[in-house]
């Protein structure tokens, strides 16, 4: 089998990270906008064709502080730390308005008609902007602190247009946009007001309105007011959580319901009359909180924005109809995955990736389809809770149906794929280590339909072998506290564990600079491999031979013989610690990645680095392969994935086709030149991009056509010949740039400058100078041509001047006779 030397990859970058701004979504739920530091991603959420529509780079390179999509999805408004408000039109893909605001802003709101935008500043001021026309319609002052919440009220053709605002001091104000004045000032909160909503209440006399306000003082206030009488506090409800968002809903019977979200990452529905909690989401194990709620589809569904930049979709309308007390999350979108420590291909079709990240939850994401012309963004993430602290590593069986995870909570968990729900369930939990579990290993041979054992390594410097119970009809999680054996393995932390292909031995790699080989059946030490100068990060068995690879902080990978337990090859080339290594291509090659952000593909027989894949800017922690190296996925500390696909055969075929075509074209060029077909020879030489052959074509064409050129008065000047001049006259912009570049190079040499000058003359005769100057890069090329042209002109002018001496001498000689 040929060596794999060429890979093509696609990058999957975090879509939401490094910004305090809350993501925003259009009312129909199809367009999502998320900040990434000083950039913004606008994403099409249409199932099956998810893609980034626009990527906005902030010219001032300042972090995005607030952004808001208009409900109709036509405009995106955003503010950066540079205090610039910008309005981006999605259809044209351009910023149509930009204006300076008086202070930094962290809150924006758009009205239901997508015509008005409210901007709240840290100086307590509020401006209302006409989105389409880009001018300020209102300016309000009166708050004593930073504006922390805004909410429009008003419908198309309505006479009542209001804006409610809250600040960090707990003050709430209601502004009349028609009369341009403050209607009410409310001071019942003792902390920042983060949620506001207004709803109309049926009244016989005149429309009455209810105002809802929620703050970080763990309470929500319900007010009643109209356009004439004072605002009346109806009730204050303690909600036992810091409120980051709140609003009104209606159930199927028209009953008014209040939702709140915030602390403890809990979203809850509250009866507005009794104040009792009707339903709520489960509290996650990880310490998170909800930073925003994004209602879509007329409040029937909502995106919950978590502090780890995960978006969870809930169907409020359906949840209100059922009798369950818990609100179920229907799907999740991962803004980023943080630091990916380890990963494996899982699922019945191995089309998913299980991730161990800096989170207690096991994350599983879909693998993008690289076979199509454009892969749909794999934004969905399945989140499985079970551990109470961060995951260190994981392993999976070859069929992808069983996963083992290792955590800092001193436990390991085995997960089983449920064919009915198409989800993974906790199968067994292993408790027994006295420190963090750092590595796990499952058998490579699953003969009875389930893995029979689990290996774990821990920071307590021990390794344990556990029995995995036989599956039963019961779905109860089995807690295993007694291991089959425990061995003191190393003197320092154990970083990796690998099981041999035949499940007879296993290897451990440690910071103590050694790799140890153990008998899997009885746990006895068989060999100690010590040749590295620094701690080991990874160890991997070869599936097709008795070989073992270890990677180390000494920047090397070593290949060991399992017969002699000696080093066969030392692979050097990384500039930093090598984090992962694995055999591919039936042991002919080895792949490694390191803290230098590079992936290297090695020839095991020669020790030569065949290919270096550069797609990361940070330390590579995770690397996984499938189909013996046909597919590779790598992930770094920034949460960036690179999916690599082997295209060696395709590239070889393309190179062969390219070489074949080049031979045919070169032969055609020779035929054209021998026939004197200078036009086709010129065009083909341009296509081949052979400077010397192009020069020879022009030179020979000039030599053969000089005798035929007629420069009598009244006739058009011909530079080469009429056909070739005509061919130059119809060149496109790209061809003109290429030809001018060749003229620039020829013009630097006294032997070739004549052809260069004639070619330039021909171009200037047949092409408009103004249009030539508009071609990108043309002016720069001309600037490089001018100095040498002036030098050639001076030299020719001096020769002409010197020729006058000969004329003078001849005249004087005639006088002697």
UniProtKB/Swiss-Prot annotation:
Signal sequence, start to end: none
Keyword terms: Nucleus, Repeat, Ribonucleoprotein, Ribosome biogenesis, rRNA processing, WD repeat
Main location as per UniProt: nucleus
One Pfam family linked to the record: Utp13
Biological function: Involved in nucleolar processing of pre-18S ribosomal RNA.
UniProt source species: Saccharomyces cerevisiae (strain ATCC 204508 / S288c)
WD repeat segments: 59-100, 102-139, 142-187, 191-233, 238-280, 386-425, 432-476, 489-528, 531-572, 573-614, 616-654, 664-705
Location in or out of the cell: Nucleus, Nucleolus
Protein name as annotated: U3 small nucleolar RNA-associated protein 13
SUPFAM superfamilies reported for this sequence: WD40 repeat-like
PROSITE patterns from the UniProt entry: WD_REPEATS_1 (PS00678), WD_REPEATS_2 (PS50082), WD_REPEATS_REGION (PS50294)
InterPro entries reported for this sequence: G-protein_beta_WD-40_rep, Utp13_C, WD40/YVTN_repeat-like_dom_sf, WD40_repeat_CS, WD40_repeat_dom_sf, WD40_rpt
Ion transport listed as a keyword: no
GO terms under cellular component: 90S preribosome; nucleolus; nucleoplasm; Pwp2p-containing subcomplex of 90S preribosome; small-subunit processome
């Amino acid at each position: 089998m040929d060596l794999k030397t060429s890979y093509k990859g696609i990058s999957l970058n975090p879509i939401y990270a490094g910004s305090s701004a809350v993501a925003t979504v259009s009312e129909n739920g199809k367009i999502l906008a998320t900040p990434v530091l000083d950039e913004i991603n606008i994403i099409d959420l249409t199932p099956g064709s998810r893609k980034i529509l626009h990527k906005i780079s902030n010219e001032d390179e300042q972090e995005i502080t607030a952004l808001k999509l208009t409900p109709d999805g036509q405009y995106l408004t955003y503010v950066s730390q540079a205090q610039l408000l910008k309005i981006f039109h999605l259809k044209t893909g351009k910023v149509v308005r930009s204006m300076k605001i008086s202070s930094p802003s962290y809150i924006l709101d758009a009205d239901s008609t997508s015509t008005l935008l409210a901007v709240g500043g840290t100086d307590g001021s509020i401006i209302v902007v006409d989105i389409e026309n880009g001018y300020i319609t209102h300016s309000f002052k009166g708050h004593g602190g930073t504006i922390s919440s805004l909410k429009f009220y008003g419908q198309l053709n309505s006479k009542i247009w209001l804006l409610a605002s809250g600040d960090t001091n707990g003050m709430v104000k209601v502004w009349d946009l028609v009369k341009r004045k403050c209607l009410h000032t409310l001071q019942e909160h003792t902390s920042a007001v983060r949620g506001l909503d207004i709803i109309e209440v049926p009244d016989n006399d005149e429309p009455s309105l209810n105002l809802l306000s929620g703050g970080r003082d763990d309470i929500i206030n319900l007010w009643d007011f109209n356009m004439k009488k004072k605002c009346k506090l109806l009730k204050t409800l303690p909600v036992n959580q810091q409120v980051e968002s709140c609003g009104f809903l209606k159930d199927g019977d028209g009953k008014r319901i209040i939702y709140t979200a915030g602390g403890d990452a809990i979203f809850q529905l509250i009866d507005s009359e009794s104040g009792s909690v009707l339903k709520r989401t489960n509290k996650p194990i990880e310490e998170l909180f909800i930073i925003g709620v994004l209602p879509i589809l007329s409040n029937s569904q909502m995106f919950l924005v978590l502090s780890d930049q995960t978006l969870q979709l809930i169907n409020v309308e359906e949840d209100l109809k059922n009798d369950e007390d818990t609100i179920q999350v229907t799907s999740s979108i991962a803004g980023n995955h943080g630091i990916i420590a380890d990963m494996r291909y899982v699922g019945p079709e191995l089309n998913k990736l299980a991730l161990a990240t800096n989170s207690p939850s096991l994350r599983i994401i879909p693998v993008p389809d690289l076979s199509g012309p454009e892969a749909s963004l794999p934004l969905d993430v399945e989140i499985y809770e079970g551990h109470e602290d961060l995951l260190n590593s994981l392993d999976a069986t070859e069929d992808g149906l069983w996963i083992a995870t290792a955590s800092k909570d001193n436990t390991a968990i085995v997960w089983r794929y449920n064919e009915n729900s198409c989800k993974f369930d906790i199968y067994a939990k292993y408790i027994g280590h006295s420190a963090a579990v750092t590595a796990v290993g499952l058998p490579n041979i699953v003969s009875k339909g389930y893995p029979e054992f689990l290996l774990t390594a821990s920071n307590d410097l021990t390794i344990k072998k556990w029995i995995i119970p036989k599956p039963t009809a019961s779905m109860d999680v089995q807690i295993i506290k007694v291991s089959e054996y425990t061995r003191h393995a190393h003197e320092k932390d154990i970083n990796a564990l690998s099981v041999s292909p035949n499940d007879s031995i296993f290897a451990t790699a440690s910071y103590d600079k050694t790799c140890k080989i153990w008998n899997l059946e009885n746990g006895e030490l068989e060999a100690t491999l010590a040749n590295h100068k620094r701690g080991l990060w990874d160890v991997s068995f070869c599936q097709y031979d008795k070989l073992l690879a270890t990677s180390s902080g000494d920047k090397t990978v070593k290949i060991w013989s399992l017969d002699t337990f000696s080093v066969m090859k030392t692979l050097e080339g990384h500039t930093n610690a090598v984090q992962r290594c694995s055999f591919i291509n039936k042991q002919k090659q080895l792949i490694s990645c390191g803290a230098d952000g590079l992936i290297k593909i090695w020839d095991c027989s020669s020790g030569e680095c065949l290919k270096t894949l550069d797609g990361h800017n940070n330390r590579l922690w995770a690397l996984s392969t499938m189909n013996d190296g046909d597919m590779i996925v790598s992930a770094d500390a920034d949460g960036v994935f690179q999916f690599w696909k082997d295209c060696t055969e395709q590239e070889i075929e393309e190179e062969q086709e390219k070489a074949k075509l080049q031979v045919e074209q070169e032969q055609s060029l020779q035929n054209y030149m021998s026939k004197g077909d200078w036009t086709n020879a010129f065009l083909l030489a341009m296509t081949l991009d052979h400077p010397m052959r192009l020069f020879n074509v022009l030179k020979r064409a000039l030599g053969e056509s000089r005798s035929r050129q007629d420069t009598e008065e009244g006739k058009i000047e011909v530079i080469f010949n009429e056909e070739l001049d005509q061919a130059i006259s119809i060149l496109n912009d790209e061809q003109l740039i290429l030809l001018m570049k060749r003229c620039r190079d020829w013009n630097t040499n006294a032997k070739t400058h004549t052809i260069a000058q004639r070619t330039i003359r021909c171009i200037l005769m047949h092409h408009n100078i103004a249009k030539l100057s508009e071609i990108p890069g043309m002016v720069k090329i001309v600037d490089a041509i001018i100095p040498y042209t002036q030098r050639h002109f001076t030299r020719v002018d001096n020769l002409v001047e010197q020729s006058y001496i000969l004329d003078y001498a001849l005249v004087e000689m005639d006088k002697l006779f």
